Amino acid sequence: MELRLFLFNRFDDPLGELAWGGRLTHAEEIGGEDTLEFECPDAPAKGDRLLWRDPDSGAWREHVVVRTDEPLRGACRVYAESSLSEMLLDFIEMAQLVSRTAEQALAAALAPTRWEAGTVEDGFGKHGCMLYHTNALAALRRIEEVWGCEAEPIVEVSGNRVSRRSVSLAARRGGWRG
């Protein structure tokens, strides 16, 4: 499957397909970074969104351009992070999670965001923690830690654009790749 990058501006308006060349590197760490690095002839703007279908899993992925290195001559180097990074701007004043399920905790963490709760596997039990003066992404990472689960962003596409963004919780995502 040929990897195609579809470019959208920060307001989710389509800008077309982004031409890229050379090597594209996708690095993902569970509960950590999820980045995309590549070179292209024309630099996308900071905040633009890249939508692509993962050739390994067939799942749609979305990344946000956070930096471009533009030399005087040659290709532009693009660095993008998972669209979950937008949750860094969503603030949680306070959420007391006392004897809550993972599903209830996820709903609290996603409340100030445009993301929805996806599928939550059974078996995480009831736990508690305090989410106080934090961002939604830090809250999501705390939920992973306390409930012993792994979060997975799910991007659904219809009509050549993102139709839904959700976060699912699983006991374990994918396999070990080193």
Can you name each region flagged by the protein language model?
Residues 1-46, 81-85:
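Juxtamembrane "anchor/assembly" segments of surface/extracellular structural proteins
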Residues 7-13, 22, 35-41, 50-54, ...:
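N-terminal start-of-chain detector that recognizes signal peptides
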Residues 11-18, 53-60, 139-146:
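Short, solvent-exposed secondary-structure boundary motifs
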Residues 16-21, 62-66, 91, 175-178:
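Short amphipathic beta-strand/extended segments with alternating polar/hydrophobic composition
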Residues 72-87, 119-178:
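Short beta-strand-centered interaction patches in the first periplasmic/extracellular domains
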